[in-house]
Amino acid sequence: MVAQTITLGDTEVKRLGMGSNRLEHTPQNIEFVRAAVAAGLTHIDTAYLYTSGESEQTVGSALDLPRDGLVVATKGGYREGEGKPDVLRAQIDESLRRLQTDVIDLYYLHRVHPDTPLEDSMAVIAEARDAGKIRHVGISEVDVGQIERARAVVPIAAVQNLYNLAQRDHDDVIDHCTQQGIVFVPYFPLRGKDAPAVAEIARRRGRTASQIVLAWLLHRSPAVLPIPGTLSLDHLRDNLATVEIELEQAELDALGAR
């Protein structure tokens, strides 16, 4: 039986969230985010970088309401030089302003940069956490060693890496997160949905290809929380319904074959 919820930080959320890297600041998108939350969405993932800040602005404008039971995550420090303490500190404050909140539920270091020691970047995020600006901390696109270096500075609630049916380079990271009680958030989770095995299982079950690859991810580990991006309420509802799908072992074997 696939678990339908997961504890992210200190909040129980559904095991399907929503990415927002294409979310522009328009009235239509503000209403879409509100409708998505009303439809049952409990986790929204955004970033300082996305749509030049408009994604964070849209989420902030949409969520001028009680946020109990909802986890909003954002990220900073993506481009070269942005992991430096002064830059990252300013990005955290700007994200707070855009999101129209006093505290960010989950804040990721978006990338580890060779020009700034990982520990220095994480220390800034830890400082913001201690100041009450951030509740929980994450890190993105990292290996197991980098996770442990980050954890030596501040507790890590989530790791966000590229992982999907077609790209499985981070199997060891998923296993490590599962063992350590860290949520693993795969981005671009829908890649691989064009595989013949996916089409066959989707046809037989009367489901969409997207639902099948998301279900495969949910079966991969109880620590997995995918964040497919969408601007469609119908697609969002389909994604949220994925937790109802119980794949059989033969189907998992067919999907897992490379």
Q: What are these regions, as identified by a protein language model?
A:
Residues 112-258:
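Beta/alpha (TIM)-barrel catalytic core signal, keyed to glycine-rich beta->alpha loops juxtaposed to Asp/Glu
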